Amino acid sequence: MEVKIEETDWDEGVPGISFLKDAFSREEISPPKDDKNRKKEEVRMKLESGEYSVVYRCPTFDEILNENGQKIDLVQCKNCFGFLSARTGGHMKNHKNQRCKPLNGPPEKKPKLDPQVVGNLQNHILDFVTESGVSLNIAESEKFRIFIISMIITGNPNVNVDEHQFLSGEWIRKTMKEKSCQYLDNIGAELKDPVSKGDACLILDYGRQLDDTFSIFVSYTNRSSGYFSLRVIPLAFTPLFEKKITEKTLDYILHATDRVGLPKEHVLKLKVVAEGATNMLKLGEYFDNCNLFTVCLSFSSKMCRKSFRSTETVEKFDNFIRKITCESDRKRNRNLWNDFLQTPALQSLINIYVLSLILLCFQLTEQLSRTPAQSRANEWLASYHCARDILHVFPQIADLKDDRIEPLVDELRQCKGVLEDCFEIFSLFENPLKLLEQPEQQIQNVAGVMFELYAQLDRIYIKAVDPKQPKECLAAVAKMAKLSIAHYTKITVTDVHLICAFLSPDSKNLKNFPAPKKNKAYRIVNTLMKDVVVPPPSLSQPILSPLLMAIKNDPSPIPTVSQEFNDYVQLVVSSKDATLAPLEFWAKYQERFPRMSEIAAKNFCVMSSPGVCGPSFIVLRSLFRVDRHSKFPDTTELMMISYLMANELK
């Protein structure tokens, strides 16, 4: 028998079954049975002498067998050191599982896992699947099963886990659904009281945060522990397969609330916050409280920034001006708009950008005290700063003797005064937009910022139309900006914004609000206070001394609506209280203002809920596939709810 000796570069793996490379030639006739022991002994001797090369059991063992099957004749068991045929078959099973007779004695009988240990292990595996957000495809896979078994054997090599089938994919899916149903029962029990009292708020997202998914959260202010805390509970993540219609949206809501045991008549009395589809506005026909609390725009500050941003090119600078004027306002003021388009201001803005490019490309900026800005961290400031820098160094540019810029300089010289008037308007937007971009900016302060900007524009407009010193271009730009701000505040600043602005400790005076808006806020709060039922004060408080008993033998009377309202209006907020979050402020003063604290808890729940849902959406997008092409959409929805409830990431 000819034996070919070859070196190998395969790495050693875990103990198991190894095989011999080129141990026997396939061209030889298989030895008879009585010669097998002699052949095995011969192989052992040549292994000890190093004549045969050995490759140990490794993760790619089966692949190596398939690729090199014709070169491999025998495999050797690392437990009993017996030689087996390399052909596939059931003769390797006992050797792979190490049930064969060891070289030094009979196989050791390994103990089984204790049933209590198995139960604990099952619970830990289920908790891992729930809290980690791992997909069921991974949890059901054979690789995950092998991983768990290998970890058990690593911790205790003398335990038998092969007979336990607790890691099957069917078991994981079934148990996962059972635990998800427990979470739904807990959600129903938690929401029963706030929903029945009308203190909760529905938060709807129609595919804006999660593509092709209708998301439903329920929020309420928890006041049971003495301080106010906002709770946001996930209710449903329904994949969308049909057209967006209001009736179907209502069916989604009622199905999700019925699943957790919330009655329909209580659900239809809740306040609604919605994003993602214009037909959500029609939900007011079905929900009772949408007359007062219509759909609240949850991204007001973000929308405000987008409404006034421009691109980095001055060719689109007139789009910046068009953007701050709504279509309906332009139709009513078409003559004013056409007069502005006929002014040389727009063409001059384009000339400014061309001039800045020429100065930069031909390196003519060395003689200037300031280089025209081409970009800014805030895109809405890029074109504005570029034009402002050109106007600032215009005298120096005019002194440059260059044929490439002289025509542009002559045209800009004629319109320089008009452009300066226009930028007087544009500069007003800088501070409000910077204020709105601050991360700590609260949404209830957006209305005050917009009203203050409107007042500034109104003063500029009155000054521009003064017959003694008229400025037609400045008046046109100021008038269009006023119309834009008025339109924005009309559709954005709802009654909820007015209530929250009045009940915020740092803006309770409503100093930037116009008189009609301020009076409306007062009127709404007074109306809501009359509907609040204040419970009688508790008489069970212990009296520590006879002196206190004599002083406080009767509970303090409950203030009337007018007394409580006037007390809050005249309240001087300390610097410390002004820094408190609104819910913290009202938790501190809930005994002094019992009615207003309840109104604040309900309305700040409406105002703050969409922002609190943001972290949940971010995590769900990164962990779950929530589109309509998901293989198991119902199971995915249950896993998303279970994940949020298990991690309290709401």
Swiss-Prot record:
Highest taxon above the source species: Eukaryota
SUPFAM superfamilies: Ribonuclease H-like (SSF53098)
Protein's recorded name: Uncharacterized protein ZK1098.2
InterPro entries assigned: RNaseH-like_sf
